[in-house]
């Protein structure tokens, strides 16, 4: 029900004091509940934290599972899907370039892009923030709803609002077709507006 989803997204974006789009420098690590774009989050405190089995333990390369079974960026996404101006590239690193990867790690020389987006506030105790919903997700939900309602200018405007904070230089999406059709090929450049969303 796209009209209802659009209404819900619009209402969520009206939250007092909400920052609709945070920059990567404001976000730091992605799971920081004190950033102004957070709509819904909670904090694992030391007495509640589980070092093994939590979402963060699987994601954080300074943690438990994540340090020995790292979550990696798809090479195509990093090399082709993201332009040099896409600041999200800062959330990926080669193990050799990360101080969080031990020098004697079997991964140190691997040519894979590890995600550094998620981490612990304190890896020894398991203290971490868990983010359940951000303003940017509502912005993208609203953009999709506008696209499906054939309000392509409205959808483009919302994407531009996001891109103004996430790209170091303007992102040109003028060549994308005004269409709510979507490709099923995850290793292809977007052709339609909905592909981009």
Roles of regions detected by a PLM:
Residues 77-78:
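Active-site-proximal, Lys/Arg-enriched surface segment
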Residues 1-59, 65-67, 81-197:
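Acidic/polar-rich alpha-helix caps and helix-coil junctions
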């Amino acid at each position: 029900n796209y009209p209802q989803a659009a209404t819900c997204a619009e209402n969520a974006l009206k939250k007092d004091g909400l920052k609709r789009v945070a920059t990567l420098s404001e976000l730091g690590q992605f799971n920081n509940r004190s950033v102004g774009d957070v709509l819904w989050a909670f904090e694992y405190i030391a007495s509640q934290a589980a070092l093994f089995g939590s979402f963060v333990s699987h994601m954080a390369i300074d943690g438990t599972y994540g340090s020995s079974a790292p979550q990696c960026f798809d090479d195509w996404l990093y090399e082709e899907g993201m332009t040099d101006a896409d600041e999200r590239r800062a959330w990926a690193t080669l193990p050799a370039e990360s101080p969080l990867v031990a020098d004697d790690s079997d991964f140190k020389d691997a040519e894979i892009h590890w995600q550094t987006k998620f981490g612990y506030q304190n890896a020894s105790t398991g203290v971490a923030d868990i983010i359940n919903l951000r303003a940017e997700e509502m912005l993208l939900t609203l953009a999709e709803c506008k696209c499906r309602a054939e309000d392509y200018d409205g959808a483009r405007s919302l994407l531009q609002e996001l891109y103004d904070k996430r790209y170091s230089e303007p992102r040109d999406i003028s060549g994308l077709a005004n269409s709510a059709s979507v490709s099923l090929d995850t290793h292809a450049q977007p052709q339609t507006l909905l592909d981009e969303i």
